[in-house]
């Protein structure tokens, strides 16, 4: 029996950072730092598959903090994510990394929810920062990106933008920072029947 395309109906938001004095070339921050960031984000035992940025309307109101979902996690499962994550080396001039994910929801001409879109933000800083700087920069850039996504599609804003952010001040040689949405439950659209 055929079935239609899959779409997520439950998600969580999370974030993590990692740093290390050790790493393997060519991207040393991708080795130990990335794993540490996944551990802090509580998604270290998933196989991570990145998405682009379109959200079905069924996710509206169904994006939870990661701590509400961890007891349902399955070791070795595939986790589909929208992730803003990057690593850096202090020797290359980066002292801090900020990341963020923003969400906008759109409505049709009748005011009904269509669905949503996400945007990712990553910024490197030459000096240490604090949470206020990380949050304000994330919101500034994500707001611009989310509004662009709505404008590009000629869609009106349904509700307030949502923002999630994270940052690290790197104290070792290498650092990594991530902010992510992870998708847990799925349904299927109706199958396509062409006659």
From Swiss-Prot:
One of its GO terms (cellular component) is cytoplasm. Its EC number is 4.1.1.19. Its main location: cytoplasm. It is an enzyme of class 4 (lyase). Keywords: Cytoplasm, Decarboxylase, Lyase, Pyruvate, Virulence. The record marks 52-53 as: Cleavage (non-hydrolytic). The modification Pyruvic acid (Ser) is found at residue 53. One of its GO terms (biological process) is arginine catabolic process. Coiled coil: none annotated. One of its GO terms (molecular function) is arginine decarboxylase activity. Its cofactor is pyruvate. It catalyses: L-arginine + H(+) = agmatine + CO2. Binds 1 pyruvoyl group covalently per subunit. InterPro entries: Pyr-dep_his/arg-deCO2ase, Pyr-dep_his/arg-deCO2ase_sand, Pyruvoyl-dep_arg_deCO2ase. It is found in: Cytoplasm. It holds the Pfam family PvlArgDC. Part of the AaxABC system, catalyzes the decarboxylation of L-arginine. The arginine uptake by the bacterium in the macrophage may be a virulence factor against the host innate immune response. Trimer of an alpha-beta dimer. Belongs to the pyruvoyl-dependent arginine decarboxylase family. This is Pyruvoyl-dependent arginine decarboxylase AaxB. The lineage of its organism: Bacteria, Pseudomonadati, Chlamydiota, Chlamydiia, Chlamydiales.
């Amino acid at each position: 029996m055929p079935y239609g395309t899959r779409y997520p109906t439950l998600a969580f938001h999370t974030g993590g950072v990692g740093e290390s004095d050790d790493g393997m070339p060519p991207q040393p921050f991708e080795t130990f730092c990335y794993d540490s960031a996944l551990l802090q984000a509580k998604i270290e035992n998933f196989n991570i598959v990145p998405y682009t940025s379109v959200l079905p309307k069924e996710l509206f109101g169904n994006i939870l903090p990661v701590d509400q979902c961890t007891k349902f996690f399955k070791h070795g499962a595939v986790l589909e994510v929208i992730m803003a994550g990057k690593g850096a080396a202090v020797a290359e001039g980066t002292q801090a990394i900020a990341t963020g994910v923003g969400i906008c929801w759109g409505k049709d001409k009748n005011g009904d929810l269509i669905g949503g879109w996400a945007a990712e933000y990553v910024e490197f800083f030459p000096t240490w920062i604090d949470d206020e700087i990380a949050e304000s920069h994330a919101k500034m850039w994500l707001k611009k990106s989310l509004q662009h996504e709505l404008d590009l599609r000629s869609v009106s804003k349904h509700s307030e933008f949502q923002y999630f952010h994270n940052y690290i001040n790197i104290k070792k040689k290498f650092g990594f920072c991530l902010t992510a949405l992870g998708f847990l439950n799925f349904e299927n659209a109706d199958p396509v029947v062409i006659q």
